[in-house]
A protein has these predicted regions:
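Start-of-helix register in tetratricopeptide repeats
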Residues: 388, 417, 421, 449-452, ...
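Alpha-helical repeat scaffolds
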Residues: 338-349, 353, 375-384, 402-412, ...
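A contiguous, surface-exposed recognition patch within enzymatic or periplasmic domains that forms
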Residues: 2-14, 52, 66-73, 77, ...
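Extended, loop-rich substrate-binding clefts of extracytoplasmic carbohydrate-active enzymes
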Residues: 19-46, 50-55, 103-164, 193, ...
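"A position-specific structural signal for the A-helix of alpha-solenoid helical repeats
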Residues: 392, 421, 453-456, 483-486, ...
């Protein structure tokens, strides 16, 4: 009989540090209304996490609602082997969209990858059901997403005596607007030089320092030891129903199975065995490397279509241990007789979120207006207008693509944060940098983000002297230093750009090309090799994917 239980674990936790307290609207590489992070503390603290445990005679599955609902562990009890990369630390690193990605386990990402709540608590529930195959026990995790109001739920289930982990996903948009979306399940697995990646032979897309089509396997890339740089692969639709990994050194592996008509997306991501391996180690405190095998209902992560208003999507997939290398050729889709997924009402809403609950209580007239950032996924316009909350209403309108309506609300306010919003609207929506600068000069210039925004507008206006004065008096934050490097280029001082970039200690930041672009331009101006050095902390991946907020 499958069992359900609840427990806790204590892990070393490196707390992420917010980039700013300002709402990051009109920033492509940040996801309003979520907090973006600019640093992670080097010294961990012990933190307790709530766990839900699903177990039968064959396997034990552990889920952590406090870390985005991820599967933390999947143990094959017949061999006592951990099938996942189960990270022994929680250490966020700088990866889109909120710059606080944590590695390990099976992560669920909707409506963008990576999930903006991967280090936050999501909703959860448990249950059991009788089936012709025996008792079925499940854990459900999910939430109503604060940006769009769309919802996701993943059900993770076991039948008695079966090692197969059932994963059933439900997505819906019960708002009045269509929203961009993607949904990817990201499974972290251990990787060594003897790890073989087993995917369908045939056409695939490879993403490394270039983006191009290949025929898999190509150049030995089905073995981890042959990949020398961070690389992603996406398989074309119509390929087979299985993929996974086999560890030749330890004699074990993990299979993923799905009907490609429901779940066509297949991805492999690896940092390889080369200089990029340090990126994998950054989120593990240097303890271990990993790769990622991913699945989803879209073909690749360059796709972010609109999820229609009132729409719903449900699909099923499965994970199972591989006892031999031959299991990959023999594996068939399970034919379980589970409770009909289409008939379930699995939604978990936002009851888990004190942030959203506070605003919903305010909306219904049951509580005061919270001091937190307004979540645009909730229908708050009437309540905000009734409360006379002009600045919060302006933020809500901006997030709803109604920035022109927000402008008179904040132009009339004297507060620096309201003036900043007015300036951003004039710049990003009205394309009026002179009017924008007038507002941004009255913004909260103690904050490096506000300094950068004003400097970008001054650059458009070619006000170099004012830029120099602004940046020289600003705190030496990383994003301010980048703007100083940009100013040196504007002043035809490319050697100063290179020196400033080279002499600053930078964090690793994935798919952020600011410093590399500056280095490239300055090097070309001096007739030097424009190759991007690793000390800049930016990867050399070609631009690809829809991981940004626009």
């Amino acid at each position: 009989m499958p069992t359900l239980s609840e427990t806790t674990c204590v892990l070393p936790y490196h707390a992420p540090v917010p980039l700013t307290s300002l709402p990051l609207v009109f920033h492509r590489d940040h996801l309003f209304p979520y907090t973006s992070y600019g640093d992670t503390l080097g010294t961990p603290v012990s933190r307790e996490f709530r766990l839900l445990v699903l177990e039968n005679d064959a396997v034990k599955v552990t889920v952590c609602p406090d870390l985005g609902g991820r599967v933390m562990s999947y143990i094959d009890k017949t061999t006592a082997k951990e099938l996942l990369f189960s990270n022994p630390v929680v250490k966020p690193v700088r990866i889109l969209p909120v710059w606080a990605f944590i590695s390990g386990g099976i992560e669920f990402n909707f409506p963008i990858a990576h999930s903006p709540t991967s280090i936050d608590t999501v909703g959860s529930s448990t249950g059991k059901a009788a089936t012709p195959d025996g008792e079925y026990a499940y854990i459900r995790v999910g939430e109503r997403e604060a940006r769009s109001g769309m919802e996701w739920v993943v059900e993770l289930g076991l039948l008695e005596n079966s090692p197969v982990l059932v994963q059933r996903t439900a997505l819906r948009n019960d708002t009045a607007r269509a929203h961009p979306w993607m949904m990817w399940t990201n499974c972290a697995v251990p990787s060594t030089p003897e790890t073989e990646f087993i995917y369908p032979a045939g056409p695939a897309l490879r993403h490394d320092r270039a983006v191009g089509d290949i025929t898999w396997p190509c150049d030995g890339s089905d073995w981890e030891k042959n990949i020398t740089q961070m690389t992603g692969f996406f398989w074309k639709p119509g390929s087979g129903h299985t993929f996974g990994i086999w560890h030749h050194d330890t004699g074990g592996g993990l299979l993923h199975l799905a009907d490609p008509a429901q779940v066509p997306g297949k991805k492999l991501w690896t940092y390889g065995f080369g200089a990029d391996r340090s990126w994998a180690l950054a989120s593990t405190d240097g303890l271990a490397g990993y790769s990622e095998i991913q699945s989803g209902p879209l073909e690749d992560q360059g796709q972010k279509p609109l999820f229609p208003a009132g729409g719903e999507l449900r699909f099923e997939e499965y994970w199972m241990p591989a006892a031999t290398r031959g299991d990959f050729a023999r594996a068939e889709l399970p034919a379980f007789h589970l409770p009909g997924w289409q008939a379930q009402t699995p939604w978990l809403g936002h009851a888990h979120s004190s942030w959203q609950c506070g605003w919903e209580s305010f909306r219904c007239g049951h509580g005061p207006m919270p001091s937190s950032i307004v979540p645009p996924g909730l229908e708050l316009e009437d309540a905000l207008r009734a409360a006379g909350a002009a600045e919060s209403l302006a933020l809500w309108l901006i997030a709803r693509d109604r920035a022109a309506e927000a402008l008179p609300l904040v132009e009339a306010l004297a507060s620096p944060t309201a003036q900043r919003l007015a300036g951003l609207i004039c710049w990003k929506t009205l394309d009026d940098p002179a009017r924008a600068a007038a507002h941004l000069r009255r913004g909260p210039l103690h904050d490096p983000i506000a300094v950068v925004e004003l400097d970008q507008v001054l650059s458009v206006l070619q006000l170099t002297d004012e830029r120099r004065s602004l940046l020289e008096s600003a705190p030496p934050h990383g994003c301010v230093i980048e703007r100083r490097a940009h100013l040196y280029l504007t002043e035809d001082r490319p050697a100063g750009t290179l020196r400033l970039l080279r002499d600053t200690v930078w964090p690793l930041e994935h798919q952020r090309y600011v410093r590399g672009t500056l280095w490239h331009k300055a090097s070309l101006a001096l007739g030097l090799d424009p190759a991007i050095p690793a000390c800049l902390g930016e990867d050399a991946l070609a631009t690809f994917g829809e991981y940004w907020s626009d």
